[in-house]
Amino acid sequence: MATRDRVSTGSSGFDKVIDGLRLGDNVVWQVDSVADYREMVDPYVAQARADGRRLVYVRFGSHERLVTADDAQTVVFEVDPTHGFETFAMQVHNLVEQEGIGAFYVFDCLTDLLPYWHSDLMIGNFFKVTCPFLYELDTIAYFAIVRGEHTYATIAGIRETTQLLLDLYRVDDQIYIHPLKVWQRYSPTMFFPNLVRGDEAISITSSTEVAELFSSIERQSDRLDHWNVALDRAREALALPLRDQEAVKASLMRMVIGGSARMFDLCADYFTLADVLAIASREVGSGLIGGKSVGMLLARRILERDGDARFTSLIEPHDSYYIGTDVFYTYIVQNGWWPLRAKQRTADGYYTLAPELREKLLAGRFPNDLREQFMEMLEYFGQSPIIVRSSSLLEDDFGNAFAGKYESVFCVNQGSPEERYRGFEDALRLVYASTMSEEALDYRMNRGLVDRDEQMAILVQRVSGDQHDEDYFPHVAGVGNSSNLYIWDPEVDADAGMLRLVFGLGTRAVDRTVGDYAKIVCLDDPLRLPPMAYGEAKKYSQRGVDVLSLAQNTWHSRTLEEVMRHDLKADRSLFLSLDEHTATRQRERGRGATSSYLLDFRGLLTRTEFPALMRDALTLLSTAYGHPVDIEFTANLSVDNELRVNILQCRPLQTRGIGAPVSLPPIEDVRDCVFCGTGNFMGGNVRIPLERIVYVRPGEYLALGEQDRHAVARHIGRLNAALKGSSTMLIGPGRWGTTTPALGVPLRFAELCNMAVIGEVASVGSGFSPELSYGSHFFQDLVESGIFYVAIVEPNLRFNEGRIVDLPNVIADVSPESAHLAHVIHVVEVPGTEVCSDITSQRVLCR
């Protein structure tokens, strides 16, 4: 505003010194004690009440209360700093927005936030996002910080943002005020120290008096950030007996580890104070390191401690770095996006403003001090490829896996230092921006996590593997589950676990790859084949290999034949076997005995300790967690078959288990069933009553163009939303969730998350073939949501389409805007119908 009304401080002498307050002023006091701050608060509060002002006291400190609600014009707003920066800042933002124009505020001493946030940086960020908003609304607000408890950088940031910054001293029981910044006001004596006596303020202008005053005040050099002070104290505690280190360890874990009480307690059981200090020493910035980092570190520690030294020589060392959650918030605040972030957190802005915030997150600038720390980290890694991985606060904890919801970005890390640095920053921005992806937003919404503080940390890992000519990759990568949820044979031991293996980078193990298949390994019998017809082992094997191309400085996909021409620095026969079936067919066709090979890892599974090692590791981890677990890993071998395994990730596997045996009803005529027989299903023993079936007709879907197939996916998403709370089965051709419409329906998991059952139908001649992609992110979503899965492949599983399409199509009633797709999507009501399955007999039916 061009003109701002003058307001009294409650002290006429002080008013003369600073020419009074102005609407919009934020007033920051540097004090030696909260009692001194109160000396300034009391007259300000009394004056505000006398003037009939709306007075708001923001209470969060552990010190004595500064204001009481003695009248109707006074509000005491209590906010809990233990919930973290974002929740705290959002609650204050919402309060200020609600109180509107012209309110007067008193905030508790900001220094009291340090024991909760452990970082000067975040106190500065809070002030930077709150002060301008208060200014815009013509408020006046009092703040305080304790002198000597904050860094010069924090004070400089506050000085830059606030309208008034004042030093308050008590010398010989007298109060002195020394204005350091008074915005848009000036007088010849304004910036001299002033002796305050009641309503009188006397400027100390004499050089002798000023020198005597300031010489009696102890001046402190720049102070270490609270974060570094806490680390120094923790290092000193290492000299104490172990039992005396526990309290210090718990405090440091709250700064670095965080997480749910269950995960925190598990970490406390396995991490020593020295362990936590080692983690903190590799952190860039401050704040929590996030769930993915914690899970990886905890898994390694469990194997080291509980593995009786067996794993010590077999686990590949790691030298990861962690970018703390405070960096994420600082990036948003320093680029001026906090108001947009606050609006995006509202119900109206949650989806509508996310694209705008995502675009900004992709284009911001990091503060210079962080850029310097990033550069030092990259200098450490040199030209080794690295991967920049999301590690949000809620990831990989009990209850929420966030599998594949946030980005992980490979940095091949070639070129000049400047080029490598730009590549790293771009990767970091991409991970941050993925917090605003539609899939991540849907996941948080569907899991009831919208109001949870979802802070994003980053895990920076050296890519496991080696250079092979101009490519870089590990020999083996994959995912492992301690509990086998996809049992196709009564002999399978569900508790032995299962692996999904690929050669090269693990991207093919977690994504549903077009025309390619990972190797499924049951750890009770590693050579047991999954259900496939004899002679189709080649079809259901891996054909492509993901690598990092050092020459092209990018992720790349190559054919298996190309990669096998490299010097693998290991015995090829560990991975490749002669394809006897193909060789036999070639001989029968008179083509000679040309060798054909199959990537089946037979040598690895029979001639090394790899399967036994992985089975034991999964058992140890699930025992320690008290819960089934899911891991991501790599394995590398030397020319003499020496094995090293790298545990990249570990998280609780959210599963309801196999369940009690189910007695399936006798079937006199299979034509009475929607489907019936023995088949491939996941979800254990079930009896699921159905209310509706949504069926995508394969022939009609096949006739559509690619754009219309995507439209079908979007309308299934509409049906999914409309049928929430209804027990519904979704059946369609090929793979649900594929990115390739030629292989199935390309919907996102959030577009089928409310289904009770999903079925994938094989369609002869169309190219549609079911594939669960065990261990993939899509698989994890199914498990976490408790959705029953069945692959409908004849002749083992008889499918009677007429039991669906002969019933009236009610799509127009459920989703009127989808009615034009009634010829493709058939929605029927099926009261009295149920899906039943039995693990022992491997029978499954819908009748």
Residue ranges and their predicted role:
Residues 116-117, 122-149:
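Substrate-engagement module of ASCE P-loop NTPases
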Residues 276-342, 348-368:
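A conserved helix-loop-beta module that forms one wall/lid of the active-site cleft
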Residues 50-115:
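Conserved inter-motif catalytic segment of the P-loop NTP-binding fold
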Residues 148, 264-265, 270-310, 365-763, ...:
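Conserved mixed alpha/beta core segments that line enzyme active sites in large multi-domain catalysts
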Residues 6-62:
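Glycine-rich P-loop/Walker A and Walker A-like loops and their local beta1-loop-alpha1 context
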